[in-house]
Amino acid sequence: MNPKQLIFHDDARDKIRRGVDTLAQAVKVTLGPRGRTVILERDFGSPQIVNSGVLVAKSIELEDRFENMGAQLLREVAARTSEMAGDGTTTATVLAHSMILEGLRYLAGGMNPMDLKRGIEIAIDAVVAELKQLSRPCASSQEIAHVAAISANNDRSIGDLLASAIDKVGREGAISIEDGSGLVSVLDVVEGLQFDRGFLSPYFINNAERQSAVLEDVAILLCEGRLSSLKDLLPLLEEIVKEGRPLLVIAEEVDNDSLAALVINTIRGTLKTCAVKAPGFGDRRKAMVQDIAVLTGGSVVSDEVGLTLGKVKLSDLGRATRAEITKETTTLIGGAGQPKAIKERIATIRKERELASSDYDRDKLDERAAKLAGGVALIKVGAATETELKERKIRVEDALHATRAAVEEGIVPGGGVALLRARRALLTLTGSTLDETSGIRLVARSLEEPLRCIVSNAGDEPSVILNRVDESPDPAFGYNAATRTYGDLLQMGVIDPAKVTRLALQNAASIASLILGTACLIATAPKPLPEEGAHGPGGETPMF
C-alpha cells in the first residue's frame, strides 16, 4: 500500500479553500449574457472555445493533491447539476463557492460545523419553498424562446429554433441535435419516436462526449418476449455484418449471456449494436412494440404470430435513418414504415381511446398517438468552422435542457433576481442556536452572489445594482445585464427555469455542507524523485 499524507483542521481547510477558489474563478467568468469564453487545450486538434461552466470545471486538474480535492468537490456540484437539470452549472458553482468561503470564515471564528450545516439545511428548505411561490407556468411559445435564448448565452436564433421545434412536436415530443452541413442551423421534422428506455450496458456507448450510442442506417430487431439465446440468430447476424449495418435490439428482456455476446461483438468491432428493453408494461408493452414495428416497417418476433427467432429474416427487421440511445431514452429517427400504415395505426389507437374506461388509459393512448403523429424534430446545427460548431452545439443542448426544465416546474425572473427575492424568506428566520442562525445568514449572503457575478462580468458595479434591485417591492424587477437596463425581467424575457434554480441551490448547499464538516484530508504521498546522476551497480547506468 502506498504511503499517505495527512493534514488536519485549519491546514486542511486552507488547502480546500485554495482549490475551490481556483476552480470557481475559472468558471465564474462564463456567467451571464456578457460572460467571457474559456479556451481549453486538447490533446489532439485545435483548442476548444467554451462558454459552459461544466465543461470548464471538468477540464481542471490541479497540481497540488490537497487543493485538487477542493477543486474536484466543487466540480461535483457542476457535474451533478448538469446531470439533473442540464443547465445552471455555473450558478451552482458560484453559490457553492460563496457558501464555502463564508462558512470557512465562521469556522475560523470557532463555530460548530454541524450546527452550521443544520442552519444551511433550514435556510435551503425555506428558500426552495419561496422559489415555488415565485414561479409561474411557462405558458407561451415566446417564453420558451426566451428561456432557450438565455441558456444559449443570449442567442435569440437558438431560442426561436427550439420554440419552433416544440411547437411542431409538442412539449413532450422528441428533439434531436446533430451536426449540420451549412452555416445556418435548420429545423427538420422527420418520422420517428422516443421512449423511456436506455441502453442495457454502457459498453454500447460510441459517442463519449454525449454518453450515448448512435447507430446510423440501423436495422431493428423487435422481440415481444425474452431474448435468451443468440444461436438461432447467428445466420441473420452474419447477413447484417455483410451488409455493414448496425443492429438495435428491442426486447422485453435480454438475458446475461445474450447481452454479453452483443457487448463483445461491439467491443471487437465485429458488429455495431445496442440492446434496450421494450417500453411499457404488460399489454401496453405489446402495443408499444407494435407501434415501433409500424413506424420502422418491421415485424415483431412473437409466438402469437408464429414468428420465432430462428425464422427471422432481414426483411423482418425494422429500419431507421438513425437511433440515439442514452442511459434513459431511445430515439428512433427516420423510420422506414409506410405513411399509410402509420396513419392507420394512429386511427386504430384513437378508436381504442374512445372505448377506454379510465382517464389513465385515455392519457396513455393519447401519448402513443402523439408520438406516432408528431415525429422527431431534428435540429441541424450550422457553423463556419468545426470549433464554432462544437461550441454552438453545446449551447443548443444547454438550451434544450433549460426549456424542458421550464416546462416541468415553471419559470422565475432570471439574472440572479429570483434567488435575491427568495432571500426574503430568511429575514426573520432563526435557528435554535447562534451557530445555526449563522448558517442561515451564510446562505442569505450567498444568494446575492449570482447577481453580483453577472453584473461584474458585464463590467458594472455589483453593490450599486444589488441595492437598487433589492429596494424594489416588485418581485420581477431586476437588472438586464445584456442591455444594461432596469425593469420587469419577465416582460424583458430574462427568465430562468425554476427547476434549474432550485437544483443549483440544493446541490451547492449539499457540497458546501460536506466541505465545512471536513477536518482531515488524506492523499497518496508523492514518490521521491531519483537522485540526479544515480547509477546502478559498478557505476553503470541501469537498463530498463
Swiss-Prot record:
Compartments (UniProt record): Cytoplasm
Reactions catalysed: ATP + H2O + a folded polypeptide = ADP + phosphate + an unfolded polypeptide
ATP-binding is among the record's keywords: yes
Main localisation: cytoplasm
Residues that coordinate or bind ATP: T30, L31, G32, P33, D87, G88, T89, T90, T91, G415, N480, A481, A482, D496
GO molecular function terms attached to this record: ATP binding; ATP-dependent protein folding chaperone; isomerase activity; unfolded protein binding
Alphabetical list of PROSITE patterns matching this protein: CHAPERONINS_CPN60
Pfam families documented for this protein: Cpn60_TCP1 (PF00118)
InterPro entries reported for this sequence: Chaperonin_Cpn60_CS, Cpn60/GroEL, Cpn60/GroEL/TCP-1, GroEL-like_apical_dom_sf, GROEL-like_equatorial_sf, TCP-1-like_intermed_sf
EC annotation from Swiss-Prot or TrEMBL: 5.6.1.7
GO BP annotation list: protein refolding
Domain of life: Bacteria
Gene Ontology CC: one annotated term: cytoplasm
Keywords: ATP-binding, Chaperone, Cytoplasm, Isomerase, Nucleotide-binding
Function: Together with its co-chaperonin GroES, plays an essential role in assisting protein folding. The GroEL-GroES system forms a nano-cage that allows encapsulation of the non-native substrate proteins and provides a physical environment optimized to promote and accelerate protein folding.
Sequence similarity: Belongs to the chaperonin (HSP60) family.
Oligomeric form and interacting partners: Forms a cylinder of 14 subunits composed of two heptameric rings stacked back-to-back. Interacts with the co-chaperonin GroES.
Entry-linked NCBIfam families: GroEL, PRK00013.1, PRK12849.1, PRK12850.1, PRK12851.1
Name of the protein: Chaperonin GroEL 2
Species annotation: Albidiferax ferrireducens (strain ATCC BAA-621 / DSM 15236 / T118) (Rhodoferax ferrireducens)
Gene name in the database record: groEL2
